[in-house]
Each structure stands twice: as C-alpha cells, then as structure tokens.
Amino acid sequence: MPTPLTLADFDYHLPPELIAQSPAAERGGSRLLHLDAASRLHDRRFPDLAGLLRPHDLLVFNDTRVIKARLTGQKATGGKVEVLVERITAPDRALAHVRASKSPGPGMRLRLAEAFEAEVLGREGELFDLRFPAPVLDLLDAHGATPLPPYITHAADATDERRYQTVYAREPGAVAAPTAGLHFDQPMLEQLAAQGVQRAFVTLHVGAGTFQPVRVQNLAEHIMHAEWYTVPEATVAAIARARAHGGRIVAVGTTSVRALESAAAQAQDGPLAAAQGDTRLFITPGYRYRIVDALLTNFHLPQSTLLMLVSALAGVAPIRRAYAHAVAERYRFFSYGDAMFIETPAP
C-alpha cells in the first residue's frame, strides 16, 4: 500500500522575486509551460496555446466578475476597521471578513469609506453578517477597492481594476480573479473560435479562502472553504457535443475544474446535468476526474489546495518536476504570473 500523501509532499521553494507583482504588458504576453500527455515539458509563449488546441475542443471559462470588495473605515469607538466582502447574501446584506483591534459585536455600526454606515447583525464562523444602507454592489462600485491577493504588495490602482479581471467577466461576486483567464484577450478568443475551438461558461465566485493555506499534515483532516457555483444547461450541452465530436474538455482555471467536477459529483453516477450551489469539493491525488481532460492554469502557492488539484490531474511527480523547472527557468508565479497547460497523462 502506498504511503499516504501529506502536506509536505506539496511544498516547494519559491524565491520571492518570482512572485509577479504586476501583469505582463499585454494580456497574451505571458510564458506558457506545457506539460504534455507524456509528461514532457515544453517552454512556450501563451499565444502557442492556439496550436495545442484542436477543432471541437471545448474551453470552459469561469465568467465570475471580481467585485470591489475591500472597504476601510472606523468603528463607532474610532478604531480602524477593514472590511472584505466575501459573499453578497441579499441586495443589502453580505458576509464579510472584518479586521479590527477588537471584533465588533451585534448592533455595532461601521462607518465605511467616509460615506455610509453598515450594521453588524451577527456572525457566521469567521464571517460577519453586515447590513448595508443601499444595494451592496452599488456601494462597492462607488467606494470599494479591488481586493488583490495578499502576496501582491502594492495597493490596487486603475491598472489592477482593469487587468485583475477577465475580458469575459459578467457575473459579479468574486473577491479573487479566476487568474488563468487573465491571459486571454479578444483577438485570441476570436482566433480560437475561427479554428473551431468551442467555448462555454460556468460561474464560480472565488472566495478569499482560495488563498488560505492547508494547516494539517493529514490532508483528510482539511476542511475545504465553500464557494458558490453554477453549471448551466448550455454548458452541459456543449460538453456533450464536444465529446460526440472527439473534442477534449479544457478547463480554463482551477475554478472551472471545481465547478465542472462539483456538477459531476452532484449527478453521482448519472449523466451530467445543470447544477448550482455551494461546493466544498477538495480534489487531491487519487481523485478520478469525470469531466476535465486538460487544464490551463497559473502556478499555485506551496502547500495549497490548488497545487493538490493540479497534482491530481497530472500526477504528483510530474507537477513537482514542472514546478522545479519553472523556478529554474525564472517563470513568473501566482495571479499575475505565467501560465501552464496540462494535458491528461496518456493511459
């Protein structure tokens, strides 16, 4: 019996200077590390992806839109407070992370952005239930800031508002971008369509939990964060058409993987059907993928659930080798970094 994998199996050394602090000059200007079906590595540029895709392949994009979820302000006592909206639960209500010297209690009012007050209604685990005086999305659009990942050290600016968002984003609700999609510009999408590559969409609202480290050595003890997703009927039909024509299902990003495989899990042994709801799907090596044949993704944090997910698709050893190669070749890592195209290992 093989030794169970532990957190240490997903660690690697990353020089801090390889963490990309800003996007490439152009969306398609990144490098692309290609891990092919024979587990061979190829150094490419992102536009080379077009030559790796075939007619009838189906690209599945996550169309979530990053909201300006970060707010700063004061408690009634004058103490500073920072709010990160995690999930909008009603037009005027949201669950949020609240950072303050002392946690606010029910009934406390928070003065935010020097513009309005939000009332603390209660708490759900680590999140605070807040009531806003107007639609949450409207207030965030007017007064919020783009919530950049914790490893990006500068404050969000106008460039981040534009570039930390995919060109096809349309469903507001994410507090982190589905970063594999950041590499696509409109000309690239049009080129792929012209060569017969199909596209479909899912929605998964990426939460701040995507950046949380795994804190247990025994992976079976990890409690996965919940994220809301939907796989529409049109995407289910597109998957069936691609399969019928011999095309591959290529997930653009790990969030698309989670949505597709969550829908498959909901269908159990039946055919894939439209699905939506919260998912806590935790994909680790040994998981049997039911929908995804290939994956476009960025490079992920050491010891993260997303590194485990890609290792489940390609194998632990090939991913470890790919990451060592990426570090040696000075690829740029994480949200604003370079991309990786992973094809399912040949049987």
UniProtKB/Swiss-Prot annotation:
Protein name per UniProt: S-adenosylmethionine:tRNA ribosyltransferase-isomerase
| Subunit structure as annotated in this protein's UniProt entry | Monomer.
Reactions catalysed, as given in the entry? 7-aminomethyl-7-carbaguanosine(34) in tRNA + S-adenosyl-L-methionine = epoxyqueuosine(34) in tRNA + adenine + L-methionine + 2 H(+)
Give the gene name.
Answer: queA
| A cellular component term, taken from the record's GO annotations | cytoplasm
Homology family: Belongs to the QueA family.
What are the UniProt keywords, alphabetically?
Answer: Cytoplasm, Queuosine biosynthesis, S-adenosyl-L-methionine, Transferase
Judged by the first EC level, this protein's enzyme class is transferase
Organism name: Bordetella parapertussis (strain 12822 / ATCC BAA-587 / NCTC 13253)
S-S bonds: none
